Swiss-Prot record:
Pathway: Lipid metabolism; fatty acid biosynthesis
Cytoplasm keyword on record: yes
Assembly behavior: Homodimer.
The keyword Cytoplasm is annotated on this UniProt entry: yes
Protein name in UniProt: Beta-ketoacyl-[acyl-carrier-protein] synthase III
Active-site residues per Swiss-Prot or TrEMBL entry: C113, H253, N283
Species of origin: Fusobacterium nucleatum subsp. nucleatum (strain ATCC 25586 / DSM 15643 / BCRC 10681 / CIP 101130 / JCM 8532 / KCTC 2640 / LMG 13131 / VPI 4355)
Length: 328
């Protein structure tokens, strides 16, 4: 049976660092308040001339290089994002153009912070079908464009960044071992941008009421996350026919330190085996899990044969996890 996995990873974060002390200058908050409640110290913000597709392209070039393939070997692009360059056009098509590729199918996928994991399962299924050989999966966001810099409860949480993976055939016995994804649509109002869509188009009133920015019911998100992360990871492990102690490392969605700590306790898995970089990048939504994995690979923390879990949750509400036996 064909084994399918990640052939190469890449990630990119903008150069502009925005610290908690920078927030102290513009809103009523403090480094201590942010750090103790979230675990975040700083985050990256895209420059004025950078769009989501620009970040995605940078990460993609690194993934292609690390997969040791040429750009022309890529036969599909899937871009998970909530912050596409334009409303009526998929940013994946813009990435295709920036990479200098032609004709290959490209589409955006919106599963909020779980988007990268959703994209991995879609790519896995398409490669398994035999229709495609090397699918580029990207998670990319410019969340700084949709956060309200007057709302201290949300603006301090988010950052910009991108991660990309090449999905294709890997050495037999390695690669994806199990997936679990799902959604609870009845909770769709917990995390959203109220205006700007077909339900409530932007107008003078929505802009005045600051409805074109992210709003979030923090306590509801916390409760959902700490209960869902262990369950969805356990389900993916069951499909992979593994136990939690078979894992070398877990790469959780980088939303909040307290969420990750609570999930670790419920999973009865050592916190030190949860890779975390949210202190430096904040919550980059669909990019967060991929950025964490890409960074860990660069540091030599992920080795061939390691069993790792990628797990996340997001607006929708969505959730997902995949278990991978690392192939290189």
């Amino acid at each position: 049976m064909q084994s399918i996995g990640i052939k190469g990873m890449g990630y990119y974060v903008p150069e502009n660092v925005f610290t908690n002390f920078d927030f102290e200058k513009i809103i009523d908050t403090s480094d201590e308040w942010i750090r103790t409640r979230t675990g975040i110290i700083e985050r990256r913000f895209a420059s004025k001339d950078q769009a989501t597709s620009d970040l995605a392209t940078e990460a993609s070039l690194k993934a292609i290089k690390n997969a040791k393939i040429s750009k022309e070997d890529v036969d599909m692009i899937i871009l998970a994002t909530t912050t596409a360059d334009y409303i009526a056009q998929g940013a994946a098509c813009i990435v295709q153009n920036k990479l200098g590729l032609k004709k290959i199918p490209c589409f955006d996928l919106n599963a909020a912070c779980t988007g990268f994991i959703y994209g991995l399962e879609v790519a896995y299924s398409l490669v398994k079908s035999g229709l495609y050989k090397n699918i580029l999966v990207i998670g990319a966001e410019t969340l700084s464009r949709i956060v309200d810099m007057q709302n201290r409860n949300t603006c301090v949480l988010f950052g910009d960044g991108a991660a990309a993976a090449i999905i294709g055939e890997v050495e037999k016995g390695y690669g994806f071992l199990g997936f679990s994804i799902g959604a609870e649509g009845e909770d769709n109002m917990i995390l959203k941008v109220p205006a700007g869509g077909s339900k409530k188009p932007n107008n003078e009133e929505t802009i005045k009421n600051r409805e074109n920015f992210v709003i979030m019911k923090g306590q509801d998100v916390f409760k959902f996350a700490v209960s869902t992360l262990p369950k969805v990871t356990s389900d993916a492990l069951e499909k992979a026919k593994l136990k939690v102690n078979d894992l070398s490392m877990v790469f959780p969605h980088q939303a909040n330190l307290r969420i990750i700590e609570s999930a670790a306790k419920r999973m009865k898995f050592p916190l030190e085996k949860f890779y975390m970089n949210l202190s430096r990048y904040g919550n980059t939504s669909s990019a967060s899990v991929g950025i964490a994995l890409g960074e860990a690979i660069e540091k030599g923390l992920v080795k061939k044969g390691d069993n790792i879990a990628l797990t996340g949750f997001g607006g929708g509400l969505t959730y997902g996890s995949t278990i991978i036996k690392w192939a290189y």
